[in-house]
Amino acid sequence: MAPVEHVVADAGAFLLDAALQDIGKNIYTIRNVISEIRDKATRRRLAVLPYELRFKEPFPEYVRLVTEFSKKTGDYPSLSATDIQVLALTYQLEAEFVGVSHLKQEPEKVKVSSSIQHPETPLHVSGFHLPSKPKPPRETVEHRHPASEPEDLEFSSFMFWRNPLPNIDCELQELLMDGGEDVPNEEEDEENGLDERQDEDSDDDGGGWITPSNIKQIQQEMKQCAVPKDVRVGCVTTDFAMQNVLLQMGLHVLAVNGMLIREARSYILRCHGCFKTTSDMSRVFCAHCGNKTLKKVSVTVSDDGTLHMHFSRNPKVLNPRGLRYSLPTPKGGKYAINPHLTEDQRFPQLRLSRKARQKTDVFAPDYVAGVSPFAENDISSRSATLQVRDSTLGAGRRRLNPNASRKKFVKKR
C-alpha cells in the first residue's frame, strides 16, 4: 500500500495508536488536537513518535469556507472548533498541492424520487386489500371442480388478503424427484453422523468468520473501504460528522488502518409530529406542521429511488422530558426575552441607542478607550439595571429543563 504524501491527523488517530508512519509521508495536525489528549498513555506515545509531527494552522478563509459548508450539510452542531480547524487544514493542503477545481462548493442534497414499485409496502398483511399483490397461481384455478365455482364467487374477496394455500402434492413430487429412489438406512445415518459433524465444525472454523487477516478484503468487497491510489492529501479521523463533511466536499478520508473510506452517512430532518421529511438542514421548525419537532435521521437512497431511514433505538433521542411546562407570560418592550415558539415570531432588534453609539465613536475627539482607567462604566441605564447581556454570550433562558428540581434552602451570604 503506497503511503499518502500529506496526511492530516485528528485526535482519534493518536488515541487509537494508528501507525501514521505507514499511512503517510508527511503528518500534519494542529496544536489544539494535542491539547485535547489527556490520558497518560497517549501522551507518552506522543513524546516518542517514530515520525516527525508537523504543526500547521489553517488560514481564516478556509475556516470560514468549511464552517459554511458544514452548516449546509447539517453537521455543524456536531463539530467542535478543533474539528473545523482540522477540516480547514485538510482543505488548505488540498488547495496547495492538488487544487480546488475538483472540490464541491455545495453539498449534494438527498432527492426522494418516486418509483413504480413499492418495495417498502408489505405484501402479505392479513386483513388488508393491496392492489399490487400478485395474482394467485394458475394451477390452483385450473384444478378446481366446476361445481364449486358459484360458491367461490361469494368468497372471491378472500383471495386478495389471504396467502395462497401451498400445493403439498407438487412439493412432495419435487422432493421425490430430487432425492431419487435410493433411501439411506438408519444405521448408515448413525455411522456417518459423527463424520458429518466433524466436517461441519471444520468448515465453520475455516470460513465465514471475520479475522484481522481478512477484514480489509471484506471491507473492499462491501465497497466501504479501498486501497488509496494516487491520493496526495488525506485526513485520518474517526468522527462521522467530519467524515461526512470531507466526503461531501470531495476530500479523501482515511481510516485508522490506512484504508480509503468511500461512503459515509447522509442526513435529513424528519418531523416526529407529522412524519414529514426535508433535506434543508438549516431549518428549525417543520415546514408542514410548524412545530419545533425536527430530528436528524441518517438515510440511504437505493438505486430505484426509495429512501431508507435508519432510526436509533436509544430512547433518549425522543425523550419528552421537559416538554410539558407552563409558558411564561409574554412581555413587551425592547429588552423582553420570550421563548422562540414559531418560525415567524418577531423579536426586538436590540439596536444601540444614539447615546450608546456616541460612546463608541472612535473618531470623536473626546473618545476614551475601554482599557483606560478613565473609561465610563454604565451602571444607570435600563439595560444595566436589568443585567441584559448579548444574546451570543448565552442570554435568555439558560436552564434546559424548566421542570428540573431547584436547590432550596440555600444559605445566603
Swiss-Prot record:
GO terms for biological process: maturation of SSU-rRNA. InterPro entries: NOB1 (IPR039907), Nob1_euk (IPR017117), NOB1_Zf-like_sf (IPR036283), NOB1_Zn-bd (IPR014881), PIN_dom (IPR002716), Ribonuclease_PIN (IPR033411), WRNPLPNID (IPR033461). The keyword Hydrolase applies. Keywords: Endonuclease, Hydrolase, Metal-binding, Nuclease, Nucleus, Phosphoprotein, Zinc, Zinc-finger. One of its GO terms (molecular function) is RNA endonuclease activity. Gene3D superfamilies: 5'-nuclease, Nin one binding (NOB1), Zn-ribbon-like. Residues 5-108 form the PINc domain. May interact with UPF2. Component of the small ribosomal subunit, ribosomal RNA processing complex (SSU RRP complex). Belongs to the NOB1 family. This is RNA-binding protein NOB1. The lineage of its organism: Eukaryota, Metazoa, Chordata, Craniata, Vertebrata.
